[in-house]
Amino acid sequence: MFYVYILQSLSKKDELYIGFTKDLKNRLVEHNQKQNFSTKRYTPWKLIYYEACLNEIDAERREKYFKVSQGRRLLRRRLKEYLYQQKIL
């Protein structure tokens, strides 16, 4: 099982990170221990959304989709209430 996930920075609320992994718990720990170049600047991070995929190819495609404008719109609709409460929308 592979996971596509969305992280939110606790130090900069409007900073979101999209990625995919096979081990979601371990990956979150890595992000919070500053082991990822893209996320070490805005630690700590919290998991706000994830989807499970049956294989790596599907997870990678879903991650790429979430990184384009149409995919971002879908995420914003799914997370609308949460993002509104966080004053991001």
Regions found by a protein language model. Name each.
Residues M1-F37, T43, Y50, I57-V68, ...:
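GIY-YIG nuclease catalytic motif and its immediate N-terminal context
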